[in-house]
Every structure is written in structure tokens, then in C-alpha cells.
Amino acid sequence: MSRRCELTGKAVLTGNLVSHSNRKTRTRFLPNLCNVTLISDTLQRRIHFRVAAATLRSVEHRGGLDAFLVKAADAQLSPGALSVKREIVKKQAAAAAQ
């Protein structure tokens, strides 16, 4: 299981911790990942993701999981999230055609 957000692609960063005496120590900055269950209004089902805490705020800000995925770039989504996005777009197109 990689340490990467499935919806935004936020991943591990590396850098230095710098002390008062300017001594540098290499460190890894890990994203705050949470296992969450989000509900898709279009698909009428629950979907499990491993996302960063900041991503949860972004999902709510955009108006829910469906709106977030439709607006998100395909390159930053995980394969699982990309398949859910395609299902949502297909179902929304079918609903609009009726």
C-alpha cells in the first residue's frame, strides 16, 4: 500500500530538519492519510478510498465526491478512483440523455 492520496496524488516529501545550530538531518514528511468511505450520489453506493485529510476538505468544498471526481484531472487519480470517475460520468450522461 503506497503512501499516496488516491484522489489528489499527494505523496511523501523529503527534506531537512534544521536545528538552531544549522545542523541538517534528512527526514521524510508523510501525508496524513485516512481510510474513508465516501458516498456517491450518482451511483448510490459507498466507495472506500485512502485519502489525505486535506483532500476530505477539498471534496466537501467542491460539493461531494461526484463533483470532485468529475472536475479532477485523470493524471492525479489512482486507477480505482479513475474507474469510479468513468462510471459516474457514464451514468450522468445517461441521465442527461433521458
Swiss-Prot record:
One GO cellular-component annotation of the UniProt record comes to: cytosolic large ribosomal subunit
Ribonucleoprotein recorded as keyword: yes
Any GO BP annotation: translation
Q: Which UniProt keywords apply?
A: Ribonucleoprotein, Ribosomal protein
Q: Which GO terms of the molecular function aspect are on file?
A: structural constituent of ribosome
| SUPFAM superfamilies (alphabetical) | L28p-like
**Pfam families on file:** Ribosomal_L28 (PF00830)
> PANTHER family given for it?
39S RIBOSOMAL PROTEIN L28, MITOCHONDRIAL, LARGE RIBOSOMAL SUBUNIT PROTEIN BL28M
> Into which family does the record put it?
Belongs to the bacterial ribosomal protein bL28 family.
Return the protein name. Large ribosomal subunit protein bL28
Q: Which organism is it from?
A: Beijerinckia indica subsp. indica (strain ATCC 9039 / DSM 1715 / NCIMB 8712)
